[in-house]
Structure formats: C-alpha cells, structure tokens
Amino acid sequence: MAPPGSRTVLLLALTIIARTQALKPTHYLTKHDVERLKASLDRPFTSLESAFYSIVGLSSLGAQVPDEKKACTFIKSNLDPSNVDSLFYPPQSSQALSGCEISISNETKDLLLAAVSEDSSVTQIYHAVAALSGFGLPLASQEALGALTARLSKEETVLATVQALQTASYLSQQADLRSIVEEIEDLVARLDELGGVYLQFEEGLLETTALFVAATYKLMDHEGTEPSIKEDQVIQLMNTIFSKKNFESLPEAFSVASAAAALSQNRYHVPVVVVPEGSPSDTQEQAFLRLQVTNVLSQPLTQATVKLEHAKSVASRATVLQKTSFTPVGDVFELNFVNVKFSSGYYDFSVKVEGDNRYIANTVELRVKISTEVGITNVDLSTVDKDQSIAPKTTRVTYPAKAKGPFIADSPQNFALFFQLVDVNTGAELTPHQTFVRLHNQKTGQEVVFVAEPDSKNVYRFELDTSERKIEFDSASGTYTLYLIIGDATLKNPIHWNVADVVIRFPEEDAPSTVLSKNLFTAKQEIQHLFRDPEKRPPTVVSNTFTGLILSPLLLLFALWIRIGAKISNFTFGLTIIFHLGHAMLAMYVYWTQLNMFQTLKYLAILGSVTFLAGNRMLAQQAIKRTAH
C-alpha cells in the first residue's frame, strides 16, 4: 500500500506541470529594475546621440535629466545644421525638456526635405522626417511615403523595416500607410520562438526587438488600428525584452525604456503583472491574500478590479471559494477569507483582473499554502502479550510530557503505540506527509526509524514485534529512546517528541558477538589496487644464444661471399654502409633486450626511412653504371 500522502504528492506534481504550461509574464521591470534602468540612462552627455538616448529614455520612464537648462544648452551648442543625422536628435530631445526651443534656417529645412528621397537610406529618411516633424515644419507625407517604400524594397533588414515603422508614425494620417503597416505582420513572422516563452529576431539583438515593439505600438496608436500581434506573442516579446536587467550600452537601455513605455501606455495591449505581496502562504490567523497589480513598469493599476474566480484544493480538486472580489487597500488588492474554513494544504487560486479591455495576461494562477498547527491526541503506549493470556497494559501520555518508566518489548510481548493527529485550529483530522517513529539505542547510538501509518479511522499505530524486527535492530538488545517525528510543509510546528524509553530484548542466540555503533559517515577502508607483475625476461644465456642464431645467416652470407670470390668493387661503399647500418636487425635486437613494441615501432620508422632512401639511391647508381658499360 502506498504511504499516506502519496496521492497528494502525485496531484501536486501534476498540477505544477499543468500550471507551467500556461504562458504568463515571467519578466518585467520591478521598481528596483526601473531605478537601475534610470541609472543606466542618466549618464554625462558625450554627443547629441547620447544626449538623445538619456533625455528621451528618462522621459519614457517618467523621469527628467537633473539639469534641463544645461541639457538644452548642450543640444544647441552641438547642433550641426549641415548634417541630417545631427538634426534628428535635437528636436526629439528638446520636446522632452521644458522651455527648450530650437529653430533652424531655411537652408537647413531644404537639406532635410532633400534627404527625403529614394536615393537616401532608410535611416536618413527616418531621421529627416522625424526632424521635420520635431521642428514643426510641413512635409508632403505621400511623397515621403513613396520614397520610404521604394527605399525599403532595397533594404530588407529587420532594423530598416523597424525604422520604416518609426518613420510612418510621423506621417499624416491622410496618407495611405497600409503598405508600411503590413510590414508588422511580416516582422512577426520573422521572429524566432525560444521554448514557447520568448520571441526575438534571429540576430538575437535585444535592442532591435525592443525598438520593434515601441515602433509598432506608436504607429498603431497613430493609425488607429490594432496591431497584428497575438496576445501570447506580446507576452513572449515582453519576456525577451525585460529578461536583461543590466545595460552597458546606452542605446540598448533606451530601447528597453521605449518598449516599457509603449507596453504601459498604448491603446490596444497592456500586459498585467500580478505579484503576491510577500509570500503567498496564509495561515488561519492571517486569512488574507494581498496582490500587487501593476503594468510592466510596476506602476499600480489602481482602477482595475480584481476577482477570485475560484480556489481549489490541490489534493481533492474541490472548489472551496469562488466569485469573490478583492478589496483595494492603497496600492494593493486584498482578499479576506477569514470566514471560510480552509483545511491546511495547498490551493490553486484563479485570479482575474478586469476593468479595461486592453488588459492581457490578466488571468493568473497562484499556489497558496494554508498553514496550521498540529496537535497530538489519544497517545497510548501498550505492552501486549502475544498469547493474550495477560490483558494489555496501557499508559496514556500527553504531549509534550514523557511517559514514566520503561516499556518492555521481548519474545513474549510486543510494544504498541497509538495516537491521532488533529488540526489545532479547526479540530479536523490531519495526515501529514512525514510521521516517523525513531528508536535510539542509549548505549551504542544505533538508530532505527519506522513509518507510522494511519488506519481507516486515521488512528496511527506502531507495533514492535522483536521476532519480526530483529534484522532492523541487528538483534542488539538494550534500552532505546522512542521519539515521535511529525512534519509537513503546511505545519507551523513540526514535532520531535521524546515519548518514552523502551527496553528491547532479543534472544541470546540472536545477539551479535560485539554490538557496534552504526555510523554511516565514518571513513571506509581504503581500496588497494593490485596490478599484474611485469613478466620476467629470459636469462642472458638464452637471449645471447637466440641472438647468435639470428646472426648466423648473416655470417653464413659473408662466408659464402668469400668462398666464391664475390666482387664488391661495384658497390658504392658510402651508400652501402649506410644501407646496412640501417638494417632492422639491430632494432630487433634492442627490442628483445630493452624496448617495448611501441618504442620499437617508433625507431623502426626512423631507420626504415633512412634505409629506404639509401637503398634506393644505391640501386639507382648501380643502374647508371650498368647503362654506362
């Protein structure tokens, strides 16, 4: 039979798997993250570009540069009226500063108008159009749209398309912007999905992804149509953009700030972030749940309404509470369920945020733990005669006291422990996950642990029969201290109770000769590795005799040459000597006396090369001599 609580553990595991499959915001900007992002943007100005990133980025987060007058002076003093890119940054920055007005000459205006051409890059067209709009100068939107569309057909990069979206947001609503708006759907198709949680462009640049989100919602707010992005895709983009918390690059910090502002303040999609205030663990003394409901910038959505759809027990899946509204308390929403009798355990709370049709990811699942205190009742210690000839001797003990006198468990009689566990707050019966009986030998330190299991009436019973349990105890008789251990993740007061002393006696023939304390953590005996002894080499006489036999054919060859009067004058002695000195026989001899196989092969490779070259050269010279004769 499965131990108590195994069914609950199984249901808990299945619920966690099901819940993790739901797409929800996993990354957003906490208040600490927002301050850190502001610090990344608040840097000394080194150029018009850096000033633009700092001023406009901080403005997106609802902040201002420390010295606006100084910032305005810096912008005016660094403006280059002959450079289109330089003219893009000042008007955008000045609009985020109070009392900073910048004007340009007619020549500069003509320069910007000339840049809105098919011959210019998408970046230059974007900068020129944004500059003209920022300076409040008129622009032929339809002509600019034609130049932008023509140029975009030649630049098909993701960044160029994003800049086209940014450009279109400055053009008149009277212009037909459909061709640019359709690019949004194409860009969404080019996004790569990572693990079903993130969406990003193939290049993996966070800056490009963030600028795409900011440009899309700015254009759609300007155009007045909902973007062709699914709500799940918005959440995936959000998870990607806000997954990074530290920024060394000023443009990257600016892009994240722009995306955060767009996702917090647009007409179509506002992701909702629901975070429990503190740990979502509630007790019977504090039966309430507080939630922070914010946008991606951790700004409270105080106008929202928060409702509990249902609260279900993880173990039984029974609905214990449903259709209940949270109460706004300052910047948080509070649910008080003091009048609802929750038994201890885990519950899934389904919470829905309403009040604005722009809200997305507005239904969340929260795992709430209801904790309680466990009480031990009806604790009986009994000595039971095996043949039932003597009535059981029962002693009742009250937690946390220890029973008086030792109890005996031996061959004629067994020892038994009975108890019940209840919820102190509600009086309901409890079956914690961990209920153990621990027996500790007072002399040797040996420990034996058993699991106490409840019966059909939830009465826990532990019985010790020495004849059946002698293996666990190694037949070690002695006085054991009995502890009751009760624990569970939902219990505020785990229990380790010294209940009584039990004298356990095993038959003498079963007792070990020496009772040793079992310590599982002592050092084990060192393992000695035995390697095979090297083979003995043959005696010197044997090796010398074998060497002589090997050399005998060579000596016989020399003797036969002398007898037949071989003419050795035709040999080229230099090469011949080298050829014969390189003979492999020498290597074979050394192999026999000194080397192993691998060393011999290495030397043979060297000798073989020299021998081959010398022999080849020698034979070639012999052939030349024969030809000459």
Curated annotation (Swiss-Prot):
<feature type="glycosylation site" description="N-linked (GlcNAc...) asparagine">
    <location>
        <position position="106"/>
    </location>
</feature>
<feature type="topological domain" description="Lumenal">
    <location>
        <begin position="592"/>
        <end position="594"/>
    </location>
</feature>
<comment type="function">
    <text>Subunit of the oligosaccharyl transferase (OST) complex that catalyzes the initial transfer of a defined glycan (Glc(3)Man(9)GlcNAc(2) in eukaryotes) from the lipid carrier dolichol-pyrophosphate to an asparagine residue within an Asn-X-Ser/Thr consensus motif in nascent polypeptide chains, the first step in protein N-glycosylation. N-glycosylation occurs cotranslationally and the complex associates with the Sec61 complex at the channel-forming translocon complex that mediates protein translocation across the endoplasmic reticulum (ER). All subunits are required for a maximal enzyme activity.</text>
</comment>
<feature type="topological domain" description="Cytoplasmic">
    <location>
        <begin position="563"/>
        <end position="570"/>
    </location>
</feature>
<protein>
    <recommendedName>
        <fullName>Dolichyl-diphosphooligosaccharide--protein glycosyltransferase subunit 2</fullName>
    </recommendedName>
</protein>
<comment type="pathway">
    <text>Protein modification; protein glycosylation.</text>
</comment>
<feature type="cross-link" description="Glycyl lysine isopeptide (Lys-Gly) (interchain with G-Cter in ubiquitin)">
    <location>
        <position position="154"/>
    </location>
</feature>
<dbReference type="InterPro" id="IPR056790">
    <property type="entry name" value="Ribophorin_II_C"/>
</dbReference>
<feature type="transmembrane region" description="Helical">
    <location>
        <begin position="542"/>
        <end position="562"/>
    </location>
</feature>
<dbReference type="Pfam" id="PF23861">
    <property type="entry name" value="Ribophorin_II_2nd"/>
</dbReference>
<dbReference type="GO" id="GO:0006487">
    <property type="term" value="P:protein N-linked glycosylation"/>
</dbReference>
<feature type="topological domain" description="Cytoplasmic">
    <location>
        <begin position="616"/>
        <end position="629"/>
    </location>
</feature>
<keyword id="KW-0732">Signal</keyword>
<keyword id="KW-0472">Membrane</keyword>
<dbReference type="GO" id="GO:0008250">
    <property type="term" value="C:oligosaccharyltransferase complex"/>
</dbReference>
<dbReference type="InterPro" id="IPR055373">
    <property type="entry name" value="Ribophorin_II_N"/>
</dbReference>
<keyword id="KW-1133">Transmembrane helix</keyword>
<feature type="transmembrane region" description="Helical">
    <location>
        <begin position="571"/>
        <end position="591"/>
    </location>
</feature>
<dbReference type="InterPro" id="IPR055375">
    <property type="entry name" value="Ribophorin_II_2nd"/>
</dbReference>
<keyword id="KW-0256">Endoplasmic reticulum</keyword>
<dbReference type="InterPro" id="IPR008814">
    <property type="entry name" value="Swp1"/>
</dbReference>
<dbReference type="InterPro" id="IPR055374">
    <property type="entry name" value="Ribophorin_II_3rd"/>
</dbReference>
<keyword id="KW-0832">Ubl conjugation</keyword>
<comment type="subunit">
    <text>Component of the oligosaccharyltransferase (OST) complex. OST exists in two different complex forms which contain common core subunits RPN1, RPN2, OST48, OST4, DAD1 and TMEM258, either STT3A or STT3B as catalytic subunits, and form-specific accessory subunits. STT3A complex assembly occurs through the formation of 3 subcomplexes. Subcomplex 1 contains RPN1 and TMEM258, subcomplex 2 contains the STT3A-specific subunits STT3A, DC2/OSTC, and KCP2 as well as the core subunit OST4, and subcomplex 3 contains RPN2, DAD1, and OST48.</text>
</comment>
<keyword id="KW-1017">Isopeptide bond</keyword>
<feature type="topological domain" description="Lumenal">
    <location>
        <begin position="23"/>
        <end position="541"/>
    </location>
</feature>
<dbReference type="Pfam" id="PF05817">
    <property type="entry name" value="Ribophorin_II"/>
</dbReference>
<dbReference type="Pfam" id="PF23860">
    <property type="entry name" value="Ribophorin_II_3rd"/>
</dbReference>
<feature type="transmembrane region" description="Helical">
    <location>
        <begin position="595"/>
        <end position="615"/>
    </location>
</feature>
<keyword id="KW-0812">Transmembrane</keyword>
<keyword id="KW-0325">Glycoprotein</keyword>
<comment type="similarity">
    <text>Belongs to the SWP1 family.</text>
</comment>
<feature type="signal peptide">
    <location>
        <begin position="1"/>
        <end position="22"/>
    </location>
</feature>
<dbReference type="Pfam" id="PF25147">
    <property type="entry name" value="Ribophorin_II_C"/>
</dbReference>
